[in-house]
Curated annotation (Swiss-Prot):
Reaction equations catalysed: 2 Na(+)(in) + 3 H(+)(out) = 2 Na(+)(out) + 3 H(+)(in)
InterPro entries for the chain: Na+/H+_antiporter_NhaB (IPR004671)
pH profile: Optimum pH is 7.5-8.5. Activity decreases sharply below pH 7.0 and is null at pH 6.5.
HAMAP family assigned: NhaB
Subcellular location: Cell inner membrane
Example of a GO cellular component annotation carried by this entry: plasma membrane
MF GO annotations: sodium:proton antiporter activity
Membrane topology: Multi-pass membrane protein
Stated family: Belongs to the NhaB Na(+)/H(+) (TC 2.A.34) antiporter family.
Species whose genome carries this gene: Pseudomonas aeruginosa (strain ATCC 15692 / DSM 22644 / CIP 104116 / JCM 14847 / LMG 12228 / 1C / PRS 101 / PAO1)
Pfam families in the cross-refs: NhaB (PF06450)
Key words of the record: Antiport, Cell inner membrane, Cell membrane, Ion transport, Membrane, Sodium, Sodium transport, Transmembrane, Transmembrane helix, Transport
UniProt-recorded name of the protein: Na(+)/H(+) antiporter NhaB
Length: 500
């Protein structure tokens, strides 16, 4: 019989993850040294990449930082990569780490302004089709200049706040009472139909907004973390990045917005739910109450946030400094002029992005393994051996398929580095490199909406507090994203193959 201490170790290992998942990760850790001894470093490295992708695909079972971190720690100990190679990767991609550390935190301090904007939109527009289009378009516009993760966080905050307000009223609970919005036990039968319709309404808006972040995020240097990686390798600043990607991103944006309208009109794939009149009345009363509470100090803070947003956009457009440093500027401006000087208040802004920043370091460790073992060199050589006109389309497909099951930052890092090495070795012209860089950028951004694993914003939505409240499961997200995946992936491939 096992001792209480050994049982405690077993329970503590990877926390609340399922037992089968814990055993799988342990099996990986035991298999890798044996495989290195029997099959050599290249085979072991390929298996490690597959194991790491598995941890990304199982992100709902356990955040990938812990199992992925254990795998790369073992890889470093086994000599599949060196700590120096990992450090070199981190130095090379330091602008991306700056982006995640400071830009996401900077936008956190604009949340009040963004919450007000989305709240006014939700209650001010009565046509569900128009509302969905505006949510998608606004998310796209914001994601082009801000961080897609933060835009998604704002939309989630609006949805959680409004759901909690109506759920409390439907449950008959007073505002002063503690209650759990995750359970419907106290909701009478009379209100349940409205509650389910409201859930479907919020689900569709959340998905439209999440897709909007992908539509806008692909367009600019700061829209997604991998864009900055690609732009850094290609030497593109903000305006140049937009110009290079526009032949693909602009038609796909238009097609995505049209898809949004058609889905709401057809009421297919889980879209088309309306906001019940009774729910609208409750939410309108809540919004009016919040507006009455807003004093001169709060209004001044909103004005500061709006001015900081303007500084942010101008700073990005003119590339006055690295993106992350502009984010730090936003933090300083907003906190200084809104009176946020408490260390703990400021610290909350960094909670959202730092786990993902740590995970990105683990990504780069896997990339270091790939580089040191030359795993992707044969694949890139096979693509480059194709006729030049077929290479962008094939890279788009290769990136898209892998991005749908893995994280697109990870995929983009691998491919853009390999293609840059081919350019440096004189295997292609600069013009052709630019075309392939666009193919990699769009290939990792557009088809990756197929599953929550591909887009960080989608994964954030799925693992957020709103997902269980509105019954947004992994399978439902895949189903609701399917029409967008087909349109964005199909048109993106055509544009990359024929319009670049």
């Amino acid at each position: 019989m096992s001792s209480p201490l050994s049982q405690a170790f077993a329970q503590n290992f990877l926390g609340h993850s399922p037992r089968w998942y814990k055993l799988t990760v342990l099996a990986f850790l035991l298999l890798n040294p044996l495989l290195l001894w029997l099959a050599g470093p290249v085979t072991s490295a390929w298996v490690l990449v597959g194991e790491f992708i598995f941890t990304l695909a199982m992100a709902l079972k356990c955040y990938p930082l812990q199992p992925g971190g254990l795998l790369v720690l073992e890889a470093l100990l086994l000599g599949l990569a060196t700590p120096e190679a990992l450090y070199a990767e981190l130095q090379h991609n330091f602008p991306v780490l700056l982006l995640l550390m400071f830009m996401v935190a900077g936008i956190y301090f604009m949340k009040d302004l963004l919450l007000l904007l989305f709240s006014r939109l939700l209650l001010g527009v009565r046509s569900k089709t128009l509302l969905s289009l505006l949510f998608c378009l606004l998310a796209a516009l914001l994601s082009a200049f801000l961080d897609a993760l933060t835009v998604t966080a704002v939309v989630i905050s609006v949805a959680v706040a409004f759901f909690a307000v109506y759920h409390r009223v439907a449950s008959g609970q007073r505002a002063s009472e503690d209650y759990d919005p995750a359970t419907d036990r106290q909701v009478p039968e009379l209100h349940r139909a409205h509650l389910e319709e409201f859930r479907a309404f919020l689900r569709s808006l959340l998905m439209h907004a999440a897709v909007g972040t992908a539509l806008g995020g692909v367009c600019t240097l700061v829209g997604e973390p991998q864009n900055l990686l690609i732009g850094h390798e290609a030497g593109w600043h903000f305006v140049e990045f937009f110009r290079q990607v526009a032949p693909v991103s602009m038609p796909v944006l238009a097609a995505g917005l049209l898809t949004c309208v058609l889905l709401e009109k057809s009421r297919r794939f889980g879209y088309g739910a309306q906001l019940p009149a009774a729910v609208r009345q409750v939410l309108a009363e809540y919004a009016a109450s919040e507006s009455r509470k807003r004093g001169a100090q709060q209004k001044a803070a909103l004005l500061v946030q709006a001015l900081a947003a303007l500084v942010l956009i101008v700073g990005l457009a003119l590339h006055v400094a690295e993106v992350g440093l502009i984010g730090l500027l936003v933090i300083v401006l907003i906190t200084a002029f809104t009176g946020v000087t408490d260390e703990h208040q400021i610290g909350r802004a960094f909670q959202e992005a730092l786990p993902f920043t740590a995970l990105l370091v683990v990504f780069f460790a896997v990339v270091a393994v790939i580089h040191q073992q030359h795993l992707f060199t044969p694949i890139i050589q096979a693509v480059l051996a194709l006729p030049a006109e077929r290479q962008p389309g094939m890279l788009f497909i290769a990136n898209g398929l892998l991005s749908a099951i893995s994280d697109n930052v990870f995929v983009a890092t691998i491919y853009i580095t390999e293609v840059k090495q081919a350019l440096d070795a004189g295997h292609m012209s600069r013009e052709h490199f630019d075309t392939l860089a666009v193919a990699i950028n769009t290939g990792t951004n557009l088809p990756s909406v197929a599953t929550p694993n591909g887009q960080a914003a989608f994964l954030f939505l799925l693992t957020s507090s709103i997902a269980p409240l509105v019954r947004l499961s992994y399978g439902r997200m895949v189903w609701m994203a399917l029409p967008y995946t087909l349109v964005m992936g199909g048109l993106g491939w055509w544009a990359v193959s024929h319009w670049l």
